[in-house]
A protein has these predicted regions:
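Conserved nucleotide-sugar donor-binding catalytic segment
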Residues: 118, 129-170
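Conserved donor NDP-sugar-binding/catalytic core segment of glycosyltransferases
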Residues: 94, 98-130
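A conserved acidic beta->alpha catalytic loop
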Residues: 33, 41-50, 90
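Glycine-rich, basic loop-to-helix element that forms the pyrophosphate-binding segment
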Residues: 64-81
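Conserved short acidic donor-positioning loop in nucleotide-sugar-dependent glycosyltransferases
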Residues: 27, 42-43, 68-69
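Short aromatic/hydrophobic "clamp" motif used to bind/position activated sugar donors
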Residues: 86
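N-proximal low-complexity "stem/linker" segments adjacent to membrane-targeting elements
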Residues: 1-29
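Acidic helix N-cap motif at the loop->helix transition within catalytic regions
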Residues: 18-21, 46-54
Length: 170
């Protein structure tokens, strides 16, 4: 068990000038001190990069270059990450509060745990998804939680995402 591990938060973006800043602020204003913030931008042309540059001193690594879609960008983030845990916080997504990471990672986490997840606020009115417990076999057919609310141990990303699988997000 390890206290206060390094958390890599990866934001992928493409032409997200209207939403990237709120995401950056949500990450860099976390009270948890052990955060490596990574932004992988797909070569935006709308001013997104200017906003990223504005906060460059608070971002461990960022790049803006063409990619093959969201999962290629996420794989770039995985390869760059040095943290023990990874979270994918896309442009436009926010942590629920400034102390979200502190609440999750300030206590010891059993070495056998490889994924941590929580509820997600679905809209600004505060409507929350209802947490449900699914058998592990459910993950073979569907993701029972949003990646924005999950933290996965780096060991779960040995091979990254398979770019050959069809995705509705591409």
């Amino acid at each position: 068990m390890k206290n206060n591990p390094l958390i890599s938060v990866v934001t992928v973006s493409y032409n997200a000038v209207l939403t990237i800043e709120q995401t950056i602020l949500s990450v860099i204003n976390q009270t948890y001190p052990h955060i490596e913030y990574i932004i992988i931008d797909g070569g935006s042309t709308d001013g997104t990069v200017d906003i990223i540059k504005k906060y460059a001193n608070r971002i461990a690594y960022w790049v803006s270059e063409p990619d093959k879609g969201i999962y290629d960008a996420m794989n770039k983030g995985i390869r760059t990450a040095k943290g023990e845990w990874i979270n994918f916080m896309n442009a436009g997504d926010l942590f629920y509060s400034k102390d979200t990471l502190e609440k999750v990672f300030s206590k010891s986490i059993n070495d056998n745990i490889k994924v941590i997840y929580g509820d997600v606020m679905l809209n600004k009115q505060g409507v929350l998804s209802q947490g449900k417990v699914y058998p592990i076999s459910f993950m073979q057919i569907a993701m029972p939680f949003c990646h924005q609310s999950s933290f996965s141990h780096i060991s779960e990303y040995t091979h990254g995402f398979n770019l050959q699988f069809y995705s509705h997000t591409s």
